[in-house]
């Protein structure tokens, strides 16, 4: 294909449609009928005529040679030459008059199709063996009934005719009849019945096989069937039956949609079978004389043999039973060809392997979609082992000469020819293969400005492929820069990497500008630097910047000296006047608020040497360098300078780090590790505490669960104390120059856990078990030995279990993490930045992430790079800090930190109104480069990769956090954050104890404006230490509560009376164990009930029956469920559960219980009250003259002054569980997750609405990652959750085209409601001929028609207002979201390929190629980045063709003018 043709075909593929082929279309595409089952003649080795490889049908095997040998290549070329001489320029196909073969290229054998004329119709297996059953849904037959009809076991009544009422027969349409029943009916009805025409309603017709199904399908009126099903659904009361009817309804709708676009329903019955081109089912000759054949040839042969045999049997009028058996066999043969895996007994080869059918070649990892269309192998690539290249620059890699010579071969040949070193291509190739020295100089020249791409498998995120400037090296291993290892997740223990060469100018330009390693310093997952020194480099930098003081034994050279500049220090160090660790004074420039200021500071020589390579703009960095501080420094330098400066800085610190790690000689020995003396006493004390806990349990003072938990906590605390002792000893040893401590403290290697196991104790171990039950995952007796002492046999045996489980888990989770990433990518691959601003008025509220009031992630780090939704004000003076629609960046983030703002409302992908993709403003900053996101960025794929990439770091099991008991007290009180005045809100108090459910305390500033500085919810039962309108100071305690138990407090003085109470055998406590509505009552002296309390299950009663109590006494304690165990069921299983939006089976249904009010610590005035009515709806405003539609999402639009004051909201978590307080809207109930037992997502969705459910989902997912120390920006989760929540379920369809129970895209739903909004529904058409009953008509047209009818004295049309559809939001799992995407190509290449393709075909779907996958499949440029449709990138890279032509024209005109002047 020429370049011109390629360009045309490339840009023409804008959409692709799929429909069912009719027999006429199959014949039109076919080049001839295949009659014989033979393939190749064993004597001549040539294809058999009219066989499966026939040259007449499919084209010649050799170029321009026919079957009989009349036309050879030379002869054909001569004929063509003669024809061209006769000016017959259009040389059409030339056919051999002997054998009928067209004289053409053999490539036609890849495209030409044949066909088989089937003797009897055959049903396509996808039509009756898929779920839901397509043919069964149309005809109302079950799968078993269909099977009996198709495989010739039963007759089906097509038309009962006279048999319906004749001679006591009661036969209905679609009744199944056995052979005996059929014969009986034929004998009963008159003999003349068979002579009637088929269209005669009195004729009895019953048939079997595909033939009868074809007739039944032709007779079906889909529109009538649709309305019948709708009526049936309306009247149906059984839920199960309704679900089945909905499934049928959906299938019928698909067929109706397809029919409108030209599909024929009867085309699902095959009369002509297409045969694919022979080159796609090859027959390859083997060395031994045999042939290796594609499985498809076997299938086609079976079909042809059976088809021919059936034809012959019909011709000789064989008995019906034999014919029926042959027809069934033919049906089975076609079934096997189309989908062998769907058959109960799959056709197998001689080696008992199921043969690969047409469907199998599309499905799965080895199928056409994933193997050949989405995962192509590429030319110009190489692969080799990687070794470290410490002398390389960040953008360079070392490329072995052999690899370079091979992949740059075409460029090398061109240069050799241009320089006239060789004359022909062949001789150039010889020169290269000889490795002539001359080629290396040319290669060096070629490498300049022509980068290579390096890729390490598995490519989990976009940094798995980066481009480098190659340098020629000797040897066979690729040199890799050590700083890019973390991005590739590479190490030098035998890892291999692939090299790819970008060929076109556009590809080279993109590799240079976008993919160069020095451009990819930041991690797209979180925006932090990923190109950070590690291991040796960190250790070297830590060592050089550590200070060492002189002691009596050893003096440090140069300590206390003063220097005027950094250079002076360097000279002194080079001349060995000062030592690297010496503490000195030096005049440096320090960065302060005003700018760079000169100061004399106390520092070390090593820090001065480090600062020589630091960019001057940044100022002097006087820090001990560790892994964490280096990350912050690199980040700061990157945002305050530029990428080239940062890349140079990274290279310099890499060299410094390696040099000083080598100079320091930082190895370690056994003496660097020692066991603390306090170990014995700590262990002894722990054993005593454990025995005391056991005694308490035996006495019945605590429950078994509490005993277990306390023992685990004792050992955990002991372990922590011991670890601290070990690390303190190391810290003091050699002034902190203990090698092991330096490795730990710098973050170069090791962790506190490993140090603890070396010289403390191994600690608690996991219990060997298959399933993890709550609170029994850990062995109570820890391993008391450490690795220095050595383990006993029992201890060793216990510890081996964990080690082995770890290895098994790693293997399992790698596959799980890969599958999770694939599902995420598929669900979000079409999310691309499409527009600048969607102009939404909605956003989300963000506050700091807290764990028990301890800040885990600050507000500033969470809102960095986001766009402010409204103006952000300073709470103290109401000054605007950040304007609406402004990005929150490093420059203005300090303002937020100083102003002590708790919550900020920002734009979010969750609330973006863009119909396709997301807008720039709602996304904010591109985390990969720190700039505002650009149009065309494929943020869906980036989000999926960012979430999936750390998947392998997550565990597969439940693990114990431990140490919970000691920490809880700190988080069971509220302190004042500022000085101010206390204000009560809905608080009822009995003896300083809160007895109201929705209590709140506000802290106001002591000014006239009374700005709210802090707002906290107060739990029921909390003890108050302040009164209303009281002045408090910062850090004063406002209230406290029991962190272990929720309580119920007596509101009156009186006597206790209760029923349905049981005693705990062990503890003697009264415990509620069954729901017999147990109640506790307070009665007065007259036995009148003052107050009655319902008691929740699991509650402990503190009072006895008949006790006299005072108001404010505690009656009941309800142990908080989460305290039973400090275990986190985390890792991949939990993540998968959340992304698939699965509901837990054991969700506690507190909403339905009578005890719910005891748990409700929510704020009644929260932002989500409106979500109780969570339906999307339209309101038709009759007074609205403009006929504008008003669609209401039921969001709380709040335009009073408070809505702009983001500071006035505060979050508070009274729960003592380990959940993070991850705030998406601090006024919501779910800012604190104060719920006993997990509430399912669907319950939150139903009760609190979509935003609360989205927030809860993101909260839960982030908790899994945070528990493992993985940082991922919220934006990525928001993009995925947006994809999961972009659809609604139709509750009432009204007058729209929707079906109740259908799932629709939100924008489609809103568009449909908008379309019908100004229309009217005709109830009676009157005398109008223009309109009919049930029609939706524009009001103006209706008015006009009624006016005309009135003039003619005719009956007017009666109409009513339209009823719009009502829907509710739903959450779909990522698998479902990926399968139900708008693109059928994308869905088919993900999962359930055959189902997706068949459903697309019957409804004649069109794929508009908006996503990435569908364009990759078709070989188009992906519509992202530089390939974005309607983008300006084309002009930037390729240039505007018209401008070039204009330039050429102007140049030609200039030349002509000059020539004319010369002539004159």
Curated annotation (Swiss-Prot):
<dbReference type="Pfam" id="PF00623">
    <property type="entry name" value="RNA_pol_Rpb1_2"/>
</dbReference>
<protein>
    <recommendedName>
        <fullName>DNA-directed RNA polymerase subunit beta'</fullName>
        <ecNumber>2.7.7.6</ecNumber>
    </recommendedName>
</protein>
<keyword id="KW-0479">Metal-binding</keyword>
<keyword id="KW-0808">Transferase</keyword>
<dbReference type="Pfam" id="PF05000">
    <property type="entry name" value="RNA_pol_Rpb1_4"/>
</dbReference>
<comment type="function">
    <text>DNA-dependent RNA polymerase catalyzes the transcription of DNA into RNA using the four ribonucleoside triphosphates as substrates.</text>
</comment>
<feature type="binding site">
    <location>
        <position position="68"/>
    </location>
    <ligand>
        <name>Zn(2+) 1</name>
    </ligand>
</feature>
<dbReference type="Pfam" id="PF04983">
    <property type="entry name" value="RNA_pol_Rpb1_3"/>
</dbReference>
<feature type="compositionally biased region" description="Low complexity">
    <location>
        <begin position="1204"/>
        <end position="1219"/>
    </location>
</feature>
<dbReference type="InterPro" id="IPR007066">
    <property type="entry name" value="RNA_pol_Rpb1_3"/>
</dbReference>
<keyword id="KW-0804">Transcription</keyword>
<dbReference type="InterPro" id="IPR042102">
    <property type="entry name" value="RNA_pol_Rpb1_3_sf"/>
</dbReference>
<feature type="binding site">
    <location>
        <position position="922"/>
    </location>
    <ligand>
        <name>Zn(2+) 2</name>
    </ligand>
</feature>
<feature type="binding site">
    <location>
        <position position="495"/>
    </location>
    <ligand>
        <name>Mg(2+)</name>
    </ligand>
</feature>
<dbReference type="InterPro" id="IPR045867">
    <property type="entry name" value="DNA-dir_RpoC_beta_prime"/>
</dbReference>
<dbReference type="InterPro" id="IPR038120">
    <property type="entry name" value="Rpb1_funnel_sf"/>
</dbReference>
<comment type="similarity">
    <text>Belongs to the RNA polymerase beta' chain family.</text>
</comment>
<dbReference type="GO" id="GO:0008270">
    <property type="term" value="F:zinc ion binding"/>
</dbReference>
<dbReference type="InterPro" id="IPR007080">
    <property type="entry name" value="RNA_pol_Rpb1_1"/>
</dbReference>
<feature type="binding site">
    <location>
        <position position="66"/>
    </location>
    <ligand>
        <name>Zn(2+) 1</name>
    </ligand>
</feature>
<keyword id="KW-0862">Zinc</keyword>
<feature type="binding site">
    <location>
        <position position="912"/>
    </location>
    <ligand>
        <name>Zn(2+) 2</name>
    </ligand>
</feature>
<dbReference type="InterPro" id="IPR007081">
    <property type="entry name" value="RNA_pol_Rpb1_5"/>
</dbReference>
<feature type="binding site">
    <location>
        <position position="493"/>
    </location>
    <ligand>
        <name>Mg(2+)</name>
    </ligand>
</feature>
<comment type="subunit">
    <text>The RNAP catalytic core consists of 2 alpha, 1 beta, 1 beta' and 1 omega subunit. When a sigma factor is associated with the core the holoenzyme is formed, which can initiate transcription.</text>
</comment>
<dbReference type="GO" id="GO:0000428">
    <property type="term" value="C:DNA-directed RNA polymerase complex"/>
</dbReference>
<keyword id="KW-0460">Magnesium</keyword>
<dbReference type="InterPro" id="IPR012754">
    <property type="entry name" value="DNA-dir_RpoC_beta_prime_bact"/>
</dbReference>
<feature type="binding site">
    <location>
        <position position="491"/>
    </location>
    <ligand>
        <name>Mg(2+)</name>
    </ligand>
</feature>
<dbReference type="Pfam" id="PF04998">
    <property type="entry name" value="RNA_pol_Rpb1_5"/>
</dbReference>
<feature type="compositionally biased region" description="Acidic residues">
    <location>
        <begin position="1220"/>
        <end position="1229"/>
    </location>
</feature>
<dbReference type="GO" id="GO:0003677">
    <property type="term" value="F:DNA binding"/>
</dbReference>
<dbReference type="Pfam" id="PF04997">
    <property type="entry name" value="RNA_pol_Rpb1_1"/>
</dbReference>
<dbReference type="GO" id="GO:0003899">
    <property type="term" value="F:DNA-directed RNA polymerase activity"/>
</dbReference>
<feature type="compositionally biased region" description="Acidic residues">
    <location>
        <begin position="1143"/>
        <end position="1200"/>
    </location>
</feature>
<feature type="region of interest" description="Disordered">
    <location>
        <begin position="1143"/>
        <end position="1229"/>
    </location>
</feature>
<feature type="binding site">
    <location>
        <position position="99"/>
    </location>
    <ligand>
        <name>Zn(2+) 1</name>
    </ligand>
</feature>
<keyword id="KW-0240">DNA-directed RNA polymerase</keyword>
<dbReference type="InterPro" id="IPR000722">
    <property type="entry name" value="RNA_pol_asu"/>
</dbReference>
<keyword id="KW-0548">Nucleotidyltransferase</keyword>
<dbReference type="GO" id="GO:0006351">
    <property type="term" value="P:DNA-templated transcription"/>
</dbReference>
<feature type="binding site">
    <location>
        <position position="919"/>
    </location>
    <ligand>
        <name>Zn(2+) 2</name>
    </ligand>
</feature>
């Amino acid at each position: 294909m020429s370049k011109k043709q390629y360009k045309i075909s490339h840009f023409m593929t804008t959409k692709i449609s799929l429909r069912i082929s009719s027999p006429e279309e199959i014949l039109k595409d076919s080049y001839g009928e295949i009659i014989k089952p033979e393939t190749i003649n064993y004597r001549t080795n040539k294809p058999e005529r009219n066989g499966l490889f026939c040259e007449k049908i499919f084209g010649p095997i050799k170029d321009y040679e026919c079957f009989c040998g009349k036309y050879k290549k030379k002869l054909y070329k001569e004929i063509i030459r003669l024809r061209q001489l006769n000016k017959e320029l259009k040389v059409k196909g030339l056919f051999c008059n002997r054998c009928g073969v067209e004289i053409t290229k053999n490539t036609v054998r890849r495209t030409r199709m044949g066909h088989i004329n089937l003797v009897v119709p055959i049903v396509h297996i996808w039509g009756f063996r898929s779920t839901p059953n397509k043919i069964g849904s149309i005809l109302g037959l079950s799968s078993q009934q269909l099977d009996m009809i198709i495989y010739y076991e039963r007759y089906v009544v097509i038309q009962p005719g006279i048999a319906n009422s004749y001679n006591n027969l009661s036969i209905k349409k679609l009744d199944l009849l056995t052979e005996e029943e059929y014969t009986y009916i034929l004998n009963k009805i008159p003999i003349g019945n068979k002579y009637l025409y088929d269209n005669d309603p009195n004729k009895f017709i019953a048939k079997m096989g595909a033939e009868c199904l074809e007739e039944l399908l032709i007779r079906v009126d889909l529109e009538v069937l649709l309305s019948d099903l709708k009526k049936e659904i309306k009247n149906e009361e059984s839920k199960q039956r309704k679900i089945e009817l909905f499934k049928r309804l959906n299938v019928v709708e698909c067929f109706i949609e397809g029919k409108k676009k030209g599909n024929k329903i009867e085309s699902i019955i095959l009369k002509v079978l297409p045969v694919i081109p022979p080159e796609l089912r090859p027959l390859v000759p083997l060395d031994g004389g045999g042939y290796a054949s594609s499985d498809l040839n076997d299938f086609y042969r079976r079909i042809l043999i059976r088809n021919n045999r059936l034809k012959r049997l019909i011709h000789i009028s064989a008995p019906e039973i034999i014919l029926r058996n042959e027809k069934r066999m033919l049906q089975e043969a076609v079934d096997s060809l189309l989908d062998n895996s769907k058959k109960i007994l799959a056709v197998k080869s001689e080696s008992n392997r199921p043969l690969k059918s047409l469907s199998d070649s599309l499905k799965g990892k080895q199928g056409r979609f994933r193997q050949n269309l989405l995962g192509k192998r590429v030319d110009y690539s190489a692969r080799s082992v990687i070794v470290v290249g410490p002398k390389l620059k960040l953008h360079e890699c070392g490329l072995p000469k052999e690899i370079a010579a091979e992949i740059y071969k075409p460029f090398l040949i061109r240069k050799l020819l241009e320089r006239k070193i060789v004359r022909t291509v062949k001789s150039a190739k010889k020169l290269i293969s000889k490795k002539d020295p001359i080629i290396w100089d040319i290669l060096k020249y070629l490498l300049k400005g022509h980068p290579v791409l390096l890729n390490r498998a598995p490519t989990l995120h976009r940094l798995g492929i980066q481009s480098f400037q190659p340098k020629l090296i000797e040897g066979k291993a690729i040199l890799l820069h050590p700083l890019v290892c973390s991005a590739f997740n590479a190490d030098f223990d035998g890892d291999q990497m692939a090299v790819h060469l970008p060929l076109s100018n556009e590809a080279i330009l993109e590799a240079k500008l976008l993919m160069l390693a020095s451009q990819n310093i930041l991690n797209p997952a979180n925006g932090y630097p990923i190109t950070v020194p590690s291991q040796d480099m960190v250790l070297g930098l830590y060592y050089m910047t550590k200070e060492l003081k002189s002691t009596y034994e050893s003096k440090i050279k140069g300590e206390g000296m003063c220097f005027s500049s950094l250079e002076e220090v360097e000279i002194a160090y080079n001349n060995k006047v000062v030592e690297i660790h010496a503490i000195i004074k030096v005049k440096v420039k320090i960065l302060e608020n005003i700018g760079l200021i000169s100061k004399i500071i106390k520092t070390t020589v090593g820090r001065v040497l480090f600062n020589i390579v630091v960019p001057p703009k940044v100022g002097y960095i006087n820090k001990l360098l560790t892994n964490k501080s280096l990350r912050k420094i690199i980040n700061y330098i990157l945002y305050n300078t530029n990428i080239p400066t940062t890349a140079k800085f990274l290279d310099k610190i890499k060299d410094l780090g390696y040099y000083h790690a080598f100079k320091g000689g930082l190895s370690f020995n056994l003496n660097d590790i020692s066991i603390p003396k306090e170990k014995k006493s700590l262990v002894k004390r722990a054993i005593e505490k454990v025995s005391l806990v056991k005694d308490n349990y035996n006495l019945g003072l605590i429950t078994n669960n509490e005993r277990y938990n306390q023992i685990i906590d004792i050992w955990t605390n002991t372990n922590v104390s011991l670890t601290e002792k070990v690390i303190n000893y190391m810290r003091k040893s050699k002034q902190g120059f203990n090698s092991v401590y330096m490795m730990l403290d710098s973050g170069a290697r090791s962790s506190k856990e490993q140090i603890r196991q070396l010289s403390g104790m191994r600690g608690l171990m996991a219990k060997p078990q298959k399933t993890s039950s709550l609170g029994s995952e850990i062995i109570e007796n820890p391993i008391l030995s450490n690795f220095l002492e050595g383990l006993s046999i029992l201890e060793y045996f216990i510890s081996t279990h964990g080690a082995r489980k770890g290895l098994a888990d790693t293997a399992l989770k790698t596959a799980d993490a890969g599958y999770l990433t694939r599902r995420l990518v598929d669900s979000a691959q079409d999310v691309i930045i499409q527009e600048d601003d969607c102009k939404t008025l909605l956003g989300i509220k963000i506050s700091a992430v807290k764990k028990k009031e301890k800040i885990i992630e600050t507000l500033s780090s969470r809102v960095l790079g986001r766009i402010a939704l409204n103006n952000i004000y300073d709470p103290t003076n109401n000054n605007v800090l950040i304007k609406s629609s402004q990005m929150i960046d490093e420059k203005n983030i300090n303002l937020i930190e100083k102003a002590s703002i708790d919550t900020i409302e920002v734009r979010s992908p969750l609330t973006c109104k863009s119909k396709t993709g997301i807008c720039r403003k709602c996304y904010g900053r591109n985390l990969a480069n720190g700039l505002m996101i650009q149009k065309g960025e494929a943020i869906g794929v980036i989000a999926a990769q960012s979430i999936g990439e750390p998947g392998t770091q997550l565990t597969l099991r439940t693990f114990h956090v431990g140490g919970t008991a000691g920490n809880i007290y700190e988080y069971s009180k509220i302190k004042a954050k500022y000085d101010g005045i206390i204000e009560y809100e809905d608080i009822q108090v009995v003896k300083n104890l809160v007895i109201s459910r929705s209590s709140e305390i506000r802290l106001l500033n002591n000014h006239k404006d009374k700005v709210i500085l802090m707002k906290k919810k107060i739990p029921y039962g909390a003890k108050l230490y302040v009164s209303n309108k009281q002045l408090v100071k910062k850090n004063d305690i406002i209230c406290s509560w029991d962190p272990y138990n929720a309580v119920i407090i007596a509101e009156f003085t009186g006597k206790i009376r209760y029923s349905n109470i049981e005693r705990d055998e062990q503890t003697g406590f009264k415990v509620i164990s069954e729901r017999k509505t147990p109640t506790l009552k307070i009665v007065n002296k007259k036995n009148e009930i003052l107050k009655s309390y319902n008691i929740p299950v699991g509650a402990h009663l503190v009072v006895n029956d008949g006790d006299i109590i005072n108001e404010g006494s505690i009656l009941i304690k309800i142990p908080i469920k989460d305290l039973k165990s400090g275990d986190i069921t985390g890792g991949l299983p939990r993540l998968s559960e959340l992304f698939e939006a699965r509901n837990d089976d054991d969700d506690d249904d507190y909403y339905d219980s009578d005890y719910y009010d005891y748990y409700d610590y929510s704020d009644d005035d929260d932002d989500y009250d409106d979500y109780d009515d969570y339906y999307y709806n339209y309101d038709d405003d009759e007074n609205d003259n403009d006929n504008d539609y008003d669609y209401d999402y039921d969001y709380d639009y709040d335009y009073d002054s408070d809505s702009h004051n983001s500071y006035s909201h505060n979050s508070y978590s009274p729960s003592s569980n380990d959940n993070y307080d991850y705030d998406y809207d601090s006024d919501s109930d779910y800012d604190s997750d104060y719920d006993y037992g997990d509430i399912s997502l669907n319950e939150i969705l139903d009760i609190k609405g979509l935003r609360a459910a989205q927030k809860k989902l993101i909260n839960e997912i982030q908790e899994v990652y945070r528990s493992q120390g993985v940082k991922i920006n919220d934006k990525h989760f928001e993009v995925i959750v947006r994809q999961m929540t972009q659809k609604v379920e139709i509750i009432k369809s009204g007058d729209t085209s929707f079906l109740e129970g259908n799932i629709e895209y939100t924008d489609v739903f809103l568009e449909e409601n908008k379309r019908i909004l100004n229309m009217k529904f005709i109830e009676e058409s009157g005398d109008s001929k223009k309109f009919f009953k049930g029609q939706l008509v524009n009001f103006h047209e209706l008015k006009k028609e009624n006016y005309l009818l009135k003039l003619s004295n005719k009956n007017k049309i009666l109409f009513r207002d339209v009823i719009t559809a009502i829907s509710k939001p739903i959450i779909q799992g990522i698998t479902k979201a990926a399968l139900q995407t708008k693109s059928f190509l994308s869905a088919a290449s993900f999962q359930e390929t055959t189902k997706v393709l068949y459903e697309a075909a019957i409804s004649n779907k069109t794929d508009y190629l908006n996503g990435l996958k569908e364009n990759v499949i078709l070989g188009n440029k992906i519509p992202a980045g530089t390939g974005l449709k309607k983008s300006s990138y084309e002009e930037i890279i390729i240039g505007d063709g018209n401008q070039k032509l204009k330039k050429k024209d102007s140049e030609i005109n200039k030349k002509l003018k000059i020539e004319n002047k010369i002539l004159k």
